[in-house]
Design a protein with these regions (language model features):
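C-terminal membrane-anchoring or membrane-association module
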Residues: 307-317
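Short, intrinsically disordered low-complexity segments
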Residues: 1-2, 314
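Mature, soluble, non-transmembrane domains
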Residues: 59-303, 311
Length: 317
């Protein structure tokens, strides 16, 4: 039973490499180059949507004939302090709450005597441990999937849908009790391989239990909530074996970074789902350029102004 699920999981989780290279110019503008390499289906799914649109210069082998792996590159120039996209998804079939969100900013400040550069971003945590702990174990070791991980996931989807839905107070306890009874009896009696193969059937049974007693007026709301949660879970699972590498070159002298490594003037961050499956994965760096010549002239000008000010005061006396 476990071997069957393992084989299916290994077929599903194919490795994809995502690489971002950021080069920040002294004037605050920055260039971004994205490279992806891996299985075609995993490249075009929604776990990590790739950059698209007219602002990006794109080269791709996705349209070529069958191959073991494919490549996708995208390049774009950003203006000073222009925000980096929180997500590259621009469709309408997924809710924002389901997506992998990656806010990032490159901030440049010019103080005349010095300039500062800040690179700061994060991959928003997926909160796996608090939602479905057994999937956290699966992420850590896909070759040994824990017993009951799909039951736990389905239970979360149904109970959380029930919790978020605007169900009448006198109906909610009844539905909660019925769902709990079904989970503890019927669902628990299903082995992992059967549930894996017939997940749509058991999902429909669970949805019938929580939706049938509720008012038809909130059916669409409940469907939307369940879809949001289900897509969120699917995206998290699809992110298994997606590896990320961020490279960065900042102007000036490096002042702070939490990068994994530094080679020459290039900073590197390497991470995967295990690094953000619960909490945010944060990457940051800052640098500065100090203009000693401007500072000296600034001091001289300041002294001259002070002398002039004192002289004017003395003359008035």
């Amino acid at each position: 039973m476990k071997k069957t699920i393992l084989i299916i999981l290994l077929l599903i989780f194919s490795c994809v490499e995502h690489k971002f290279f950021f080069r920040v110019s002294p004037d605050g503008k920055y260039e971004v180059e994205y490279k992806a390499h891996g299985d075609k289906d995993d490249l075009i799914d929604f776990d990590f949507t790739m950059p698209t649109g007219r602002k990006w210069k794109i080269n791709s082998t996705l349209d070529e004939t069958e191959a073991e792996s494919y490549d996708y590159t995208a390049h774009r120039s950003f203006k000073r302090d222009e925000a980096f996209p929180k997500t590259f998804y621009n469709g309408d079939s997924l809710y924002f709450e389901s997506l992998l969100i990656h806010p990032l900013k490159v901030k440049h400040s010019n103080w005349l005597f010095w300039e500062t550069y800040l690179f700061e971003g994060k991959f928003m945590g997926r909160k796996v441990k608090s939602k479905y702990p057994l999937i956290g174990e699966l992420i850590k070791d896909t070759e040994n999937p824990p017993d009951g991980w799909m039951k736990e996931a389905l239970e979360y989807l149904l109970t959380e849908t029930l919790h978020q839905s605007n169900i009448e107070w006198n109906t909610l306890p009844i539905i909660t009790a019925e769902l709990k009874n079904w989970i503890n009896t019927d669902l628990q009696a299903v082995n992992d391989s059967t549930l894996f193969e017939e997940i749509d059937y058991y999902k429909s049974l669970g949805l019938d239990i929580i939706m049938h007693p509720a008012s038809p007026n909130i059916y669409n709301e409940m469907d939307s909530i369940f879809k949001t949660l289900e897509d969120e879970l699917q995206i998290t699972l699809d992110l298994i074996d997606d590896n990320f590498e961020f490279q960065l070159i900042l102007p000036g002298i490096l002042e702070y970074t939490n990068a994994d490594s530094l080679a020459g003037d290039t900073l590197f961050w390497l991470f995967q789902l295990g690094d953000y499956m619960n909490e945010d994965y944060i990457f940051s760096a800052s640098s500065g350029i100090s203009y000693s010549g401007r500072q000296k002239w600034g001091i001289i000008i300041m002294l001259i102004l002070v002398v002039l000010f004192i002289g004017i005061k003395l003359r008035k006396r």
